[in-house]
Amino acid sequence: MKTQFAIFLITLVLFQMFSQSDAILQDIWNGIKNLFGKRGLGDHDDLDELFDGEISQADIDFLKEIMQ
């Protein structure tokens, strides 16, 4: 009985590790596909919205100083 329980626990742990590693590998693969895909190398700069008319030059200078 103890042996069966130990085998069950080991199987459960290995199955859990396989499930989690499969999800991680799938996310990595999707990231690579998105990076090198048809639209993957497009401009993903989301900071363009910062430079609208409502932000003053002093604000932009302050942001540049923070980013350095």
Curated annotation (Swiss-Prot):
Principal location listed in the UniProt entry: secreted
Q: What are the subcellular locations of this protein? A: Secreted
> From which organism does this entry originate?
Scorpio palmatus (Israeli golden scorpion)
Pro-peptide positions?
A: 37-68
Renumbered to this chain, the signal peptide range is 1-23
Q: What tissue specificity does the UniProt entry give?
A: Expressed by the venom gland.
Q: Which UniProt keywords apply?
A: Amidation, Antibiotic, Antimicrobial, Secreted, Signal
As for family, the record states: Belongs to the non-disulfide-bridged peptide (NDBP) superfamily. Short antimicrobial peptide (group 4) family.
Name used for this protein in its record? Peptide Smp13
Phenylalanine amide PTM positions read F36
What residue intervals traverse the membrane? none
Q: What does this protein do?
A: Peptide with unknown function. Does not show antimicrobial activity against the Gram-positive, and Gram-negative bacteria tested, as well as against the fungus C.albicans.
